[in-house]
């Protein structure tokens, strides 16, 4: 929020895959909608732009990025969210410097704010060397949540998953929290398949969502222990030997 309140500055969220960079922006949108932000940010709306839609040029040769900015200049109080923003570095016709400079007028007026997101590796590889970009976009490091924070995130996300799927995890909050803790422990750092590269909370949330998928496949409005067990058995994010051990523990606990 402090970066967005700073004139001529926008933010770029930097963190490992799966740490919740997009969720931060969703949380900001929720707070803006509820008016739980400083007065200067009230009335802003967030537009989520797909990076792929901004790459390249139009048939007439005009840069898609430039075209987007020209359209946004007609609007007021816009926060543009661009995931994988590193893909736009060097995507304009002349050089990578152009991308940051294209935003100069909008950022200067304060009517356009940008939140970018990228991984730590892509930031160091593409963005760090772009001085024009780093002048206008302040790096915000997004660390991986702790075990306890991830359990809390999962408990907070559960109602949203239930609303989206129409299925319910019908247990007491005590049992629900035990289930979340189990899924979080199952997906801790040294149990993850290295090539997957995902982190808390996404890797744990993926397991939970898979359990809901199995319930929907069964045409069930309730997610039960067997659906969770099935999600664990078929997980592609955790080493097979870890899954075998945890399934035994799962049977004992639940």
Language-model regions: role of each:
Residues 1-254:
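AAA+ P-loop NTPase nucleotide-binding core of proteostasis motors
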């Amino acid at each position: 929020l402090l970066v967005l309140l700073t004139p001529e500055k926008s933010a770029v969220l930097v963190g490992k895959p799966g740490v919740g960079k997009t969720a931060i922006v969703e949380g900001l949108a929720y707070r803006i909608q509820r008016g739980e932000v400083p007065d200067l940010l009230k009335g802003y709306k967030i537009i989520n732009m797909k990076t792929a839609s901004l790459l390249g040029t139009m048939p007439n040769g005009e840069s898609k990025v430039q075209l987007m900015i020209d359209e946004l200049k007609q609007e007021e109080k816009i926060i543009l969210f661009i995931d994988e923003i590193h893909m736009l570095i060097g995507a304009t016709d002349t050089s990578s410097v152009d991308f940051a400079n294209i935003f100069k007028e909008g950022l200067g007026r304060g009517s356009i704010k940008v939140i970018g997101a990228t991984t730590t590796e892509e930031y160091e590889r593409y963005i760090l060397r772009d001085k024009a970009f780093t002048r206008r976009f302040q790096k915000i490091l997004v660390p991986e949540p702790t075990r306890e924070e991830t359990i809390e995130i999962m408990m907070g996300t559960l109602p949203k998953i239930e609303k989206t799927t129409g299925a319910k995890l019908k247990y007491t909050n005590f049992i629900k929290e035990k289930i979340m803790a189990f899924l979080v422990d199952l997906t801790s750092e040294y149990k993850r398949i290295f090539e997957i590269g995902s982190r808390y909370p996404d890797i744990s949330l993926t397991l939970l969502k898979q359990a809901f998928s199995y319930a929907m496949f069964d045409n069930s409005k309730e997610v039960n222990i067997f659906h969770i067990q099935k999600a664990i058995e078929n997980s592609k994010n955790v080493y097979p030997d870890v899954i075998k051990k945890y399934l035994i523990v799962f049977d004992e606990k639940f």
